[in-house]
């Protein structure tokens, strides 16, 4: 989003394949990073590695561009501490900025394109998480996730004159550094109906709406390659500002038959109204977004190792 970049999905790969649901449901085999309370259903040590790839297409009436990229999705280790307590530690990308745009202009009507305007953004924010899930009694679950967010995002605007024989690139740099903690709480309720049939209810809420950040602005002159700096001048020394964050609340309901099937529905609401731009100043108020997800899973024979569809 504005400032810290495009957000990565909060759901792990196993939940993405089910439309992102996971607020109320967990099979106890894969680690649930959507609702920390449901970690208490994991009674085995689990280590997960996820990767993410994407293909983007940018197109207008004159030209078309495709961008392909990828990144690690998550590294997570889940450890049962006791029969009622499970902890998890992991690292995953939180957001990223990655774009490069150029435009060309002639200095006169008869000349060739000799001015190059460049707009570039690079950087990312990483999330290091430590979560705990507790089972209270037989039917209630509570969880808390603590995250440390850190990273840098650099946005540059440049002008390069190709007609003077020097080819110097004049660049205005805006470097933002992020470092702070965030928290998320979760709860779940699991009620037995009959014959291994359960109804599950869950909820999560972000407890942090802002984080600390610093910004440095400087003016630089680069050579033709754009790699070597000839001269630089700090326009404004590093100063602190507060980056407002979107706050998400999730609710989930699911019906589950152990080791057989599960159907569920999740609702999430994200408040973007206080999110500001990368300069720490308010922009036009953004709306509140909502999302509904309905999906499920079916296992023909949970104990089969020779044929998945048995």
Residue ranges and their predicted role:
Residues 1-17, 80-310:
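Outer-membrane beta-barrel porins/channels
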Residues 1-95:
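N-terminal, post-signal peptide beta-strand-biased segments of exported outer-membrane/organellar beta-barrel
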């Amino acid at each position: 989003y504005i400032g810290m970049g495009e957000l990565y999905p909060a759901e792990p790969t196993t939940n993405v394949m089910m439309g992102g649901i996971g607020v109320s449901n967990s099979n106890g085999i894969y680690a649930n990073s959507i609702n920390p309370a449901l970690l208490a259903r994991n009674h085995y040590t689990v280590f997960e590695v996820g990767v993410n790839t994407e293909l983007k297409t940018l197109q207008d009436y004159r030209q078309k561009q495709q961008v392909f990229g990828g990144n690690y999705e998550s590294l997570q280790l889940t450890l049962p501490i006791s029969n009622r307590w499970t902890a998890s530690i992991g690292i995953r990308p939180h957001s990223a900025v990655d774009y490069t745009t150029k435009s060309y202009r002639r200095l006169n009507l008869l000349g060739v394109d000799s001015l190059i305007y460049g707009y570039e953004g690079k950087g990312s924010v990483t999330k290091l998480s430590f979560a705990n899930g507790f089972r209270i009694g037989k039917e209630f679950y509570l969880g808390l996730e603590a995250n440390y967010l850190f990273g840098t995002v650099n946005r540059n605007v440049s002008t390069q004159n190709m007609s003077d024989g020097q080819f110097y690139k004049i660049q205005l740099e805006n470097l933002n550094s992020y470092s702070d903690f965030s928290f998320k709480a979760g709860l779940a309720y699991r009620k037995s109906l009959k014959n291994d049939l359960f109804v599950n209810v869950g909820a999560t809420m972000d407890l942090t709406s802002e984080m600390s950040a610093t910004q440095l602005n400087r003016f630089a002159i680069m050579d033709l390659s754009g790699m070597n700096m000839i001269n630089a001048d700090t326009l404004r020394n590093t100063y602190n500002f507060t980056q407002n964050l979107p706050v998400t609340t999730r609710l989930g309901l699911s019906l589950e038959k152990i080791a057989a099937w599960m159907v569920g529905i999740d609702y999430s609401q994200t408040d973007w109204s206080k999110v500001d731009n990368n300069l720490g100043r308010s922009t036009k108020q953004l709306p509140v977004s909502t999302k509904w997800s309905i999906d499920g899973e079916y296992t023909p024979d949970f104990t089969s190792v020779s044929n998945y569809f048995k």
